């Protein structure tokens, strides 16, 4: 059992007797109230999706499934293909990746964990930190140094990350895949 606050994208939880893949998590904390966790879920058996809201301390039944270390191989619309050390290939539907699809690029060497349910690859968990190149961002605004200045940047793979003002096109940055936050320039 995990609390709702500990659930991450790629985890598989049991709700109402069915396994659900967590595609996205969003935590909201307010001053006096407890944290609220909003989960975007996809049913493994029925391919239906839903959003559920939980209190941060709610207990959820995390299913322990078979996991295998794999690397990304190629994209065969609408499937992402991953390969293990023995060159076995596993297809994962693009819908099951959720936000992780923004960080997957051709030639990436990051080792991912592919999760299986009844022999079918259902989700992928990326490493906690990955390095990607900034392919587009606005130039820094000269003189705007009051506090922590952030701006949007597009990274290889097509995702958008909010980065510090000093980051420019061509820089390699480290990203926390759990939250999608910029960590540092590499």
UniProtKB/Swiss-Prot annotation:
Q: Name the SUPFAM superfamilies on file.
A: Nucleic acid-binding proteins (SSF50249), Translation proteins SH3-like domain (SSF50104)
Q: For this UniProt entry, what is the primary localization, expressed as one broad class?
A: cytoplasm
Alphabetic keyword roster: Cytoplasm, Elongation factor, Protein biosynthesis
Task: Note whether Protein biosynthesis occurs among the keywords.
Answer: yes
Instruction: Spell out the Pfam families in the cross-references.
Output: EFP, EFP_N, Elong-fact-P_C
Q: Extract the SMART domains matched here.
A: EFP (SM01185), Elong-fact-P_C (SM00841)
Tell me the GO molecular function terms.
translation elongation factor activity
Q: Which domain of life is it from?
A: Bacteria
> One cellular component GO annotation, for this chain's record?
cytoplasm
Instruction: Report any one BP term from Gene Ontology.
Output: peptide biosynthetic process
Query: Keyword Protein biosynthesis on this protein?
Result: yes
Main role? Involved in peptide bond synthesis. Stimulates efficient translation and peptide-bond synthesis on native or reconstituted 70S ribosomes in vitro. Probably functions indirectly by altering the affinity of the ribosome for aminoacyl-tRNA, thus increasing their reactivity as acceptors for peptidyl transferase.
Q: Which PANTHER family match?
A: ELONGATION FACTOR P (PTHR30053), ELONGATION FACTOR P (EF-P) FAMILY PROTEIN (PTHR30053:SF12)
Per the similarity annotation, which family is this? Belongs to the elongation factor P family.
Protein name, as recorded: Elongation factor P
Question: What species does this protein belong to?
Answer: Shewanella frigidimarina (strain NCIMB 400)
Taxonomically, what lineage is the organism? Bacteria, Pseudomonadati, Pseudomonadota, Gammaproteobacteria, Alteromonadales
Its encoding gene is what? efp
């Amino acid at each position: 059992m995990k609390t709702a606050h500990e659930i991450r994208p790629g985890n598989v939880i049991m709700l109402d007797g069915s396994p659900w893949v967590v595609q996205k998590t969003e935590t909201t904390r307010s001053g006096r109230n407890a944290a609220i966790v909003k989960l975007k879920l996809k049913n493994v058996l029925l391919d239906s999706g839903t959003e559920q809201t939980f209190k941060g301390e709610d207990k959820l039944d995390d299913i322990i499934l078979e996991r295998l270390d794999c690397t990304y191989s190629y994209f065969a619309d609408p499937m992402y293909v991953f390969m293990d050390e023995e060159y076995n290939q596993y297809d994962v539907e693009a819908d099951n990746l959720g936000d992780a699809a923004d960080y997957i690029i051709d030639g990436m060497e990051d080792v991912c964990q592919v999760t299986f349910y009844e022999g079918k690859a259902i989700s992928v968990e990326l490493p906690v930190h990955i390095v990607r190149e900034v392919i587009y961002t606005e130039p820094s605004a000269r003189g705007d140094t009051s506090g922590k200045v952030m701006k949007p940047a597009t990274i290889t793979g097509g995702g958008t990350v909010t980065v510090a003002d000093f980051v420019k096109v061509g820089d390699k940055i480290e990203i926390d895949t759990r939250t999608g936050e910029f960590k540092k320039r590499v």
